[in-house]
Structures are given as C-alpha cells and as structure tokens.
C-alpha cells in the first residue's frame, strides 16, 4: 500500500512538471532524534504582501494535512505534531523534538484566494523527505536470568532498531560467538542452543551497533540438572584404629545439595559397626573415626539435588592390621583313610607371611608325621586320616605388622567319607524321546548330599533328580548326550563318579578339532568325528574362497564327499596364496548334523627354483580377462552356447566354468570341466518354458577371470531333455504334485463311494427278496364263478379285517385288461424252472370228518367249467358282477360266502398237472387297482412299473373242498339255506368270455347287493380286525348313506379319489361311524377272523329274508344248486364258545402248517423274483 502511494506521488510530481508551470524539486532533510529540523517551502512571493492565501503541509500516508494556516487564524495541527511544529520564513515548517516516527515524505501547498482560474488555485511546492537518525534500541530481549533443564533446547532472541539499522552480535563469557558452532547457532540476532549441557551455563551478551552508537543486553543462563562432582574422593590407606577423611564436593543448580556415602553399596548409616564412628561434613566429606579391618572397602559419594540420575564417585579405603585368625571351628572332621585338611582361617594386611601350629599344646613338628605338610594359606594337610591325626590344634598367623595372637583350639575328629552305594554304568545308550534313569546313591558320616551335573554345557529344565538321587532324563533329547557327573559330598570329603550318555535315533553330532594343513594348490582337512546317532554317518568337506575385492560377492560353497570311514580329505585344485574357508558336515539316514567351526587356510604355491638375476621387469603380466561374445542359440538338439576366448591370457588357458540360473535365482555351476580349447557347448537337460541366463568364467594357472557377458534364452516351444514343463508362476512341483494326488484320491474316493452305495442297494434288495421268499406261501382267492347276488341295506362290521399281501400280476398290463377287456395271458415260465413244462395246480384244503385240515381231491376242469356254467347265468349283468364279492365297512350289500378251494402250497407231481393255471379273476384285478396298492400292510409292495412275466405260483388246485362242518347242522336243511345264499361260488375255471372290469362289478354290486344284508352286519373283506396284530388300510368309498365320515373312508365333500381315469369307480359319499360297528371277532388277538357272517347268525337272520330273495328273478337258477364248496365254510363244527373255538382253530391250523412245511421241504423251491400286485395273500 505504501509503495502504491509513493508511486502516486511520483506520478503527480511528474505530471506537474509536464504542465510546465513549475518544475518540482525534491529536497532531503536530515535530523537527529530529539533535535529540530526545517522543511523549506518557497511558494510565496519574495517581496510585497502576498494575496490572501491558505498554507497546508501534508504528510504522505496521512488522510488530512498535518498543518493548515489561513490568514491570522490559529493553525490546525495534527495531534501527533501539537506543540512541535510552526511556520518559519514564509511557508517553511519547523519541527522540534524529532522522533523516529517523524521520518517520511512531506508536501507544501499554498492556495491563493485571488486566483479565478481553477487551474491556478493551488501552488504546490516540492516534496521534502525527512530522515531522522537515532541510536540503536532493543525491541525484544531475552530475560536477564533464564533457567533451562539439562539436555533441552533454548533460544535467545534480540531485536533492535535504529537509523541506520543496527547490527546484532552475541558473546558468551566475553567471547564473540560469530555464526556459532556445534550445538550453538547464531542467525539474524537469534541464539539457538540445540542441547543444553552443564557447560552451557553462563552469561550471554547481546550487542546492537550502528553509526549512531551501540547498546548491549546480558542474560544469565542457568542449567537445571543433577549435580556435578567437582572434587571426587581419592583412595586412602590408614592403619587400624586411626581416623580418615574422604573428600567429596559438587556443584549444581539448584544448589540444595544432599550428600550420601555408601560402603560396598550399603549406606554407611545402615551399617551398625559404622553408625557411631562416621560423620558427613557440610562440604560433603566423609569422616571415619578409629578405623577397623572391616572398614576396608569401596566408599562411594553420591550428591543429589532432587533431579534424576545423580552422579557418583568412589574411592577405596585400605586398612593395615597384623595377621589374625577370624573364626576357628571348635571341631574339625577328617575323613578316615583319606586325605584331610585342617584349615586356619586367617586375614592379614599386609599379606600373610607364615603360620605356626600347635598340637595338644605343643609345637607341631611336621617332620615327625610322614605325609603331613603346610598349604599355601597356612592350612595343615594330612595325607591319610588315622588315629595320629586326633588331638587339639591351634594356629598363629604372622605378617609384616606381626600377629594378633593364636587361634582358639579346634578338636580333630575322624569321620567316614562318602561312599557310593549305587554307581552309574560307564555309558548308557537310549533312543531319543524315551526316558532314561541313571541311579546314583551314597552313604557317609554325616550323610552326604548327592548332586548331578553335565560336564561342559549345562542342560537346564530337562534333567531332574528323583527322591533316590537318580538322574531322570524325560524326554531324552539330543542335547542330553555327553558326560554326566554324580558327586556326593559331606563335611568330610567329596567324591565323584561319571558316566557317558549316548542318544540313539538322532542326526550326527558336530565334528570337533577340525584342522587344515595347507599344501601346494591344495589343503589336507582332518577332524574328529562326533557321535553318529546310532546310524552310519558320512562326511563332506565344504570350502569356499574369500573375495579378493570387496566389490565382488563371495563364491558359493563347494562340497566334496569323504570316503566312508575316513576322517581326513585332500582338497586339490585350490589357488595358491588365496584364503579359503573350510567346514565339515556329518550326515546319516536321519539328516544332517551341524556344520563344524569354520577354519581359514591359505594354500601354498609351487616350489620355485632360483633363477638367474635379470633386469627388473618393466611390465606386470597381464591378468586373465573374461571370455568374450557369449551367445546362446536354440537348436533341435538343445541350447548351443558360443563364445570367443579371453583377450588376455597369462600363459596357457586351463578351462572354463559354465554358470547358469533360472530367472532371478542364484547362479549355479552347471559344468566346471569345460576344456580351454572349446569355443562352443551344447547344454542339454533344460526345462521347458523357462528363461535361462548363462555366463562363463575362465581360469588359467592361479588366475580366475571375471564372469563374461550374460546370454539370455527361453526354452518356450523347444523340445529339450528331459521333456517336462515347470510352472514357476503357479505352484512349486512338490505342492503341485500334492494337489494332483489329492484330486486323484478324491476322485477315487467318490467312485468307491458310488460303487459301495450300489452294492449296498443290491444287497438290500436281495435281503428284501429273500425275506419275501421266506414268508409263508400265499393263499390265493380263486373265484369259482360269477357273483350275481342281490344285497339288502345294512351295515357291515368294521371289527374284522383280512390282511392282503399284494403280489405280482400275471397279467402283462392291468390297465389294458381293465380298459379293453382283453383276456389275461398266463406268465411265461422260467426257462430253468421245472414248471416251465406246464402250470402246477394247487391242492385243495378243507376240513375232514374229524375237523382237521386235509388235502381234498382235485376237480376236473370239465367239472369246474360245468359248475361255473350252472351257477352263473350268461347275462350282461352277470358278466359285470364277475368280480369277487368284497364288502367294505359300509352297508353296500349282504356279504357272500367265501370258498377257499385250496390254501395248501403242496403241489402234486408234475405228471398230475392236468391244465394250465386259470386266468386272474375279477377279484385279483380289483385288488391290483391303485387303491389296493396303497393298502400294503407288509411294506413289500413293489413300485408301480410295467409288470414283467414271472413264473406261476407253486401250485393252485381248483378242486372243490370236501364237506366239513364247523358247527352242528341247524334244524332246517342246510342245503336249502345254503342254496338261497346269493353269491355262492361254484368253482374256478377259465372262461372264454372277456373278463369284466372292476367298474362294472362295482356298479352291479350297488344295484343288486343292498337288499341282502339287512340283518347280517358281519365283518367284510376290508373291515378292520379287533386284533392288535392287524393293520388297517384304505377301502373303496362306501355306498351306504351316513351322516358322519369313517376313519377308513374319505370325508364328505372330499374331491380326491382312489382311482382315476378309466379305472375310476362311481363315488358314493356314504360312510358309517366307528361307534356303530360290531365286534364279531372270536378273539381280539387272533387275526384269522371270519370274513363272512357267522353260520348261526346267518341261519337266524336268513328266514325272514327268504321270501324277499324270491323277488329277484335273476337269482332263481341258483336257489337249488348245491356245490361242494358250500360245506367248506357253512358247516362249521359247533364249539362251546368263541374262546374254545378260536383255540381249537389255532391248534388245527398250526398242525396243518407243520405238515405243509414238511411237504415243502421235500420239493425244490422256486425262486420267484417278481411279485404280482394283482394277487392277494391272506395272512
């Protein structure tokens, strides 16, 4: 801003000069501070009275003029100039009491009031520059006294001003510091001490000088810190009982010093024998009165002023006294039969000169006791402890100051020395990691103390001593090998024994005593082997030359194998007068041991013969230069290296050494026997896809050249030897091999798991198949005719359920049979089965006259067919009702009597088989529907798949049963009653008509059966048994109306169905509750419940229904028919009650099963591999 104003003023001056009115003048006025100065202005006319005008004085940098005078009025003066300015001789301004602040630019202006031209209103004078000279003055100075902690930094700053500007300098203790040096630096009047020390304390003077004068300022720097010992104590010697003074003086700031004295590290006031005889003076000196021999030692002075780490100074005090005995024991034991010593505890200063002994009050004469002598410290040595040594002894020591007197008497006693009871063996061999116990025990008087120690290096933390003083090494480590010493000591003597421990199963131990004998261009290395660790060890000698020049790196170590059993090796081919390092390494099958210590050696040169003196050589033989122009070329055989021989060869070239490396790895010697005459070399055995670097080193005589230039080449795409690829960017080969092995193992494991799973599934399927084969042969329900009976409304009993085991269907396609009515084809017989030549019929089983199960005679096919034709009218309605009558739990109709023609699995001879098996009846087709697939109670239902042809059952007999009654005949003829029963089965035969579907059968049953079972609500084929062993399953939907739903039938309103498509039966939402069902089972634990109404109950309820049954014209032909099957179930033998009848039935059936099993055992078993879902087995 000031420069801008100055430029403005100059521009105004220049512009005014350009106007031509008056040329401005610049005047400089110099004054001293406190004096006066006149600033001239000649704008007024020199003579006459000037016109009316106004005088103004302006100062550059001020907004208003500092002085304004108009006529005779009082001037207007700036407050800073009040009382110090006035006009003199016209318009000149006089300033009194000049100040430094008055220095600057001033301008004089005069305004003439009679001028009418605006351009001539003002007459400006020249600018005047006022300079005020003043002596130097300090604007900033450091304090007079400054305290600074030791080792801290401090800054002393002096700032002065004046006109002209003064120059500031610093002085320390009267000496000019200049620019400073070391820790002290001076710059622009500022003194900076980086690290204050004790010597930095003192007076620092700041001086500001100029032409107007000089001024100074002094600062005292005080360094706060621990004291500094100025006068330390010195070593002193004093006779016993004299006083002594040890000086100690220190300086410090602050000066609140406290002195402390210590003897051998203990405060003198804490030592009881010194408390009353010691004083510490004001100046820090130690005063010790009446010194004693125990007062000798190191004394330390420690001054302190509260700062940390106070200094200290020490001195040694020597006290002279005559020789004296310290403490003589009252008894001295000596070992019997061993060497003993009677000691005389002496102290003396000056040193001891001699000791005299007395025995039993008489002077001891050593020449009378052979083997007795005096030791260097005056002890009495007895070679053999016996009765001659017994007695009372006293000693008197002497030095240059005399003696303090004889010692007290000591009584010599004979004691038994320690003796080992259990000594360790000379050596122990034990495997590493196991436990080793070495015994050692001793006895003596007094009992000795047994201790163990390892000779040489100690073994801390691994060796323990048990309660029996035995050494326990647990676990045994390699470091435990060595010599161990067991010592037993008591007050009489100390005895020792030792043993060697060898640890087996470790790497070799380090070799020792390695020595190298230099030879011409070689060296002979020898050593002493260490323990081999229990295995054969081999040695190798390692050596390397030291670098001749510091800028060259060390060569790699070279190893030479040592023949087995040798402990020395001759290392040839070394450079003479070159320093080598040698080391020996031992190895065995477990690994390498540590290297031995490194030994340096310099091989000698070849012996030379004296040569004739000649002229001194003018040139030094040229050194060996490196090979030149090394290049690498790819060829089909590998990598070919080509080079030129060295340019400088001192003599004959011995050969080359080829070195190579992969990428940035270390250099390796590839071939060290390249002949010196070769200029090219084929390098086989390289790795694919790797960048190689090669170089050559030449050697001749004792010279080894520097490496040649480096030749780079890549083996990418080159077939080399051996052909393998390395992946340096991915994984190392060991890691890669491990990864590949792990992947292969995982694949094999997965494959084995899959095979095991398949094998287990096959075994599980085989076990299920064998389980089915071991089960009882199925009881086949063979329909003998067509059922065309009427039914009456009623409720069926849910208390009895007949179990079905669904088996494989002989029909190739049940769906096709049901939809199109195609006749079922018999299954293809197994080619290896004896049944392949024809079906094997089943024998009928029925009751005999005595009520036992017996085999009945077979019925001829013609008779069966005739029976079937007579019992079944050939109407479409009868065809639709061909399915077997299976009543559900709902009252769909009167259940029809069931005729089991033959439940025996015992087959007739093959020659007796008259005809093939009949085709599957409507009941079997009905049971093969998907609804009955869900009713499997044994868990063996096969999956829904296309049935394959399978061999037929072992035997199925179609002969009607002979008549056998369970109950006594009723009053009315049973034949008539049985004749009127609808649905009586006449026989089994193969019909030429197509089979009826289950849908037609169910529709006919709904129309015919409801009127027949109004008074006979017995259990049906699908009702549940009251026995706890029975299993429930789903049934077809009920056809009887009911208000509630059954737990075995779908709920009302349910839109789901148990059949679908063409197999769907008409749905009827009729169910009965469980609470309305009757229990008709003779035993709740017996599962052979009756599937039909009881005989007595049927006879009682049948008479009212006879008349009503006549109303059905379609049943007239069946009323007078009497078939052999009717006697199978409708003529039971009378029993006293349900329990007795059930027990009798069970016993009879078990007897039948035993006979059947015996018969089956004599027949070949047929392996049925596929079950038929359209056959039902009654359990």
UniProtKB/Swiss-Prot annotation:
Residues 507-611, 623-718 form the Fibronectin type-III domain. It is found in: Cell membrane; Synapse. One of its GO terms (cellular component) is dendrite. Residues 944-954 have a biased composition (Pro residues). Residues 756-1179 are cytoplasmic. The chain crosses the membrane at residues 735-755. Residues 767-807, 819-842, 942-974, 1016-1079 are annotated as: Disordered. It is a single-pass type I membrane protein. It comes from the Eukaryota. GO terms for molecular function: cell-cell adhesion mediator activity. Pfam families: fn3 (PF00041), I-set (PF07679), Ig_3 (PF13927). Glycans are attached at residues 188, 239, 256, 513, 524. Disulfide bonds join 41-108, 158-206, 248-301, 344-395, 440-486. SMART domains: FN3, IG, IGc2. Keywords: Cell membrane, Developmental protein, Differentiation, Disulfide bond, Glycoprotein, Immunoglobulin domain, Membrane, Neurogenesis, Phosphoprotein, Repeat, Signal, Synapse, Transmembrane, Transmembrane helix. Residues 24-124, 136-216, 226-318, 322-410, 418-502 form the Ig-like domain. InterPro entries: FN3_dom, FN3_sf, Ig-like_dom, Ig-like_dom_sf, Ig-like_fold, Ig_I-set, Ig_sub, Ig_sub2. Residues 1-20 form the signal peptide. Residues 21-734 are extracellular. Interacts with MAGI2 and SHANK1. This is Protein turtle homolog A. It comes from Mus musculus.
């Amino acid at each position: 801003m000031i420069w801008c104003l100055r430029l403005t003023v100059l521009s105004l001056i220049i512009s005014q000069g350009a106007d031509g009115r008056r040329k401005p003048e610049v005047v400089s006025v110099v004054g001293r501070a406190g004096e006066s100065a006149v600033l001239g202005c000649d704008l007024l006319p020199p003579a006459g009275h000037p016109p009316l005008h106004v005088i103004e004085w302006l100062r550059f940098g001020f907004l208003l003029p500092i002085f304004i005078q108009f006529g005779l009025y009082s001037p207007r003066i700036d407050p800073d100039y009040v009382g110090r300015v006035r006009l003199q001789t016209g318009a000149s301004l006089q300033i009194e009491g000049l100040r430094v602040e008055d220095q600057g630019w001033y301008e004089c202006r005069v305004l003439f009031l009679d001028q009418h031209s605006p351009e001539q209103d003002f007459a400006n004078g020249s600018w005047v520059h006022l300079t005020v000279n003043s002596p130097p003055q300090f604007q900033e100075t450091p304090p007079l006294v400054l305290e600074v902690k030791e080792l801290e930094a401090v800054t002393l700053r002096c700032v002065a001003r004046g006109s002209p500007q003064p120059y500031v300098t610093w002085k320390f203790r009267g000496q000019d510091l200049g620019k400073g040096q070391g820790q002290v630096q001076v710059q622009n009047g500022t003194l900076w001490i980086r690290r204050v020390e004790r010597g930095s304390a003192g007076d620092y003077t700041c001086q500001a000088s100029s032409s107007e004068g000089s001024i100074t300022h002094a600062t005292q720097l005080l360094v706060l810190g621990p004291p500094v010992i100025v006068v330390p104590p010195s070593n002193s010697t004093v006779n016993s009982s004299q006083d002594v003074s040890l000086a100690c003086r220190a300086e410090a700031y602050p000066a609140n010093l406290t002195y402390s004295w210590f003897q051998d590290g203990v405060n003198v006031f804490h030592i009881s024998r010194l408390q009353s005889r010691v004083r510490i003076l004001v100046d820090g000196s130690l005063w010790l009165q009446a010194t004693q021999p125990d007062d000798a030692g190191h004394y330390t002075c420690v001054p302190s002023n509260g700062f940390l780490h106070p200094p200290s100074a020490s001195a040694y005090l020597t006290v002279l006294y005559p020789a004296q005995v310290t403490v003589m024991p009252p008894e001295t034991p000596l070992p019997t039969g061993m060497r003993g010593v009677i000691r005389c505890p002496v102290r003396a200063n000056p040193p001891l000169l001699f000791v005299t002994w007395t025995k039993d009050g008489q002077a001891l004469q050593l020449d009378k006791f052979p083997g007795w002598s005096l030791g260097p410290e005056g002890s009495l040595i007895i070679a053999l402890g016996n009765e001659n040594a017994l007695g009372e002894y006293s000693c008197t020591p002497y030095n240059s100051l005399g003696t303090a007197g004889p010692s007290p008497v000591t009584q010599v006693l004979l004691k038994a020395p320690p003796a080992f009871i259990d000594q360790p063996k000379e050596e122990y061999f034990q495997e590493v990691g196991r436990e080793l116990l070495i015994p050692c025990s001793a006895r003596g008087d007094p009992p000795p103390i047994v201790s163990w120690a390892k000779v040489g290096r100690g073994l801390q933390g691994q060796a323990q001593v048990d309660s029996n003083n035995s050494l326990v090494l647990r676990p045994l480590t390699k470091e435990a090998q060595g010599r161990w010493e067991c010592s037993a000591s008591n007050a009489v003597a100390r005895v020792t024994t030792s043993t060697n421990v060898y640890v087996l199963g470790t790497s070799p131990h380090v070799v020792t005593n390695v020595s190298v004998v230099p030879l011409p261009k070689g060296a002979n290395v020898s050593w002493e082997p260490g323990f081999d660790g229990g295995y054969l060890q081999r040695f190798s000698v390692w050596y390397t030359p030291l670098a001749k020049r510091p800028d060259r790196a060390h060569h790699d170590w070279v190893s030479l194998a040592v023949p087995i059993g040798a402990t020395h090796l001759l290392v040839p081919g070394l450079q003479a007068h070159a320093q080598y390092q040698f080391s020996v390494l031992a190895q065995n099958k477990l690994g390498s041991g540590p290297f031995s210590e490194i030994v340096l050696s310099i091989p000698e040169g070849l012996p030379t013969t004296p040569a004739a003196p000649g002229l001194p050589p003018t040139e030094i033989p040229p050194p060996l230069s490196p090979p030149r122009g090394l290049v690498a070329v790819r060829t089909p055989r590998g990598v070919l290296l080509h080079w030129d021989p060295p340019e400088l060869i001192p003599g004959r070239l011995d050969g080359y050494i080829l070195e190579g490396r992969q990428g940035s790895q270390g250099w390796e010697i590839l071939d060290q026997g390249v002949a010196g005459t070769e200029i090219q070399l084929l390098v086989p055995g390289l790795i694919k896809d790797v960048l190689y670097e090669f170089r050559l080193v030449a050697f001749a005589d004792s010279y080894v050249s520097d490496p040649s230039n480096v030749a780079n080449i890549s083996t990418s795409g080159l077939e080399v030897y051996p052909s393998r690829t390395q992946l340096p960017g991915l994984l190392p080969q060991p890691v890669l091999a491990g990864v590949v092995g792990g992947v292969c193992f995982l694949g094999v494991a997965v494959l084995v798991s899959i095979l095991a799973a398949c094998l287990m599934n096959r075994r599980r399927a085989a076990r299920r198949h064998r389980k089915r084969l071991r089960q009882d042969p199925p009881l086949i329900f063979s329909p003998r005719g067509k059922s065309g009976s009427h039914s009456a409304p009623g409720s069926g009993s849910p208390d009895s359920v007949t179990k079905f085991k669904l088996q494989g269907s002989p029909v190739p396609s049940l769906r096709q049979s049901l939809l199109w009515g195609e006749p079922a084809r018999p299954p293809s017989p197994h080619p290896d089965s004896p049944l392949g030549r024809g079906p094997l019929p089943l024998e009928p089983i029925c009751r005999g006259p005595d009520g036992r199960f017996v085999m009945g005679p077979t019925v001829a096919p013609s008779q069966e067919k005739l029976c079937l034709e007579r019992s079944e009218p050939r109407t479409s309605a009868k065809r639709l009702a061909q399915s077997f009558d299976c009543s559900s739990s709902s009252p769909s109709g009167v259940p029809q009597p069931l005729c089991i023609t033959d439940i025996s699995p015992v087959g007739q001879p093959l020659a007796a088989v008259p005809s093939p098996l009949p085709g599957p009846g409507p009941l079997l087709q009905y049971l093969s529907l998907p609804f009955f697939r869900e009713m499997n109670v044994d868990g063996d239902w096969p999956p829904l798949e296309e049935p394959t042809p399978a061999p037929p059952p072992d035997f199925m007999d179609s002969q009607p049963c002979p008549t056998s009654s369970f109950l006594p005949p009723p009053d009315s003829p049973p034949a008539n009653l049985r004749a009127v029963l609808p649905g009586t089965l006449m026989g089994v035969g193969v019909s030429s008509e197509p089979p009826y579907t289950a849908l037609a059968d169910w529709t006919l049953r709904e129309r015919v059966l409801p009127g027949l079972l109004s008074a006979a609500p017995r259990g049906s084929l699908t009702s549940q048994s009251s026995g706890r062993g029975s299993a429930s399953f789903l049934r077809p939907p009920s056809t009887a109306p009911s208000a509630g739903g059954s737990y075995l039938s779908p709920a009302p309103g349910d839109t789901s169905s148990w059949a679908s498509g063409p197999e769907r039966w008409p749905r009827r939402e009729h169910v009965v509750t469980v609470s309305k069902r009757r229990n008709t089972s003779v035993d709740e634990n017996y599962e052979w419940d009756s599937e039909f109404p009881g005989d007595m109950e049927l006879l009682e309820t049948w008479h009212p229904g006879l008349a009503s049954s006549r109303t059905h014209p379609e049943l007239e032909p069946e009323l007078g028919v009497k078939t052999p099957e009717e006697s199978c179930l409708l003529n039971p033998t009378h029993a006293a009650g349900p329990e007795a009848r059930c027990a009798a039935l069970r016993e009879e059936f078990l007897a039948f099963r035993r006979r059947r099993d015996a018969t089956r055992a004599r027949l070949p078993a047929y392996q049925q591999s596929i079950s038929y879902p359209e056959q039902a087995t009654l359990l």
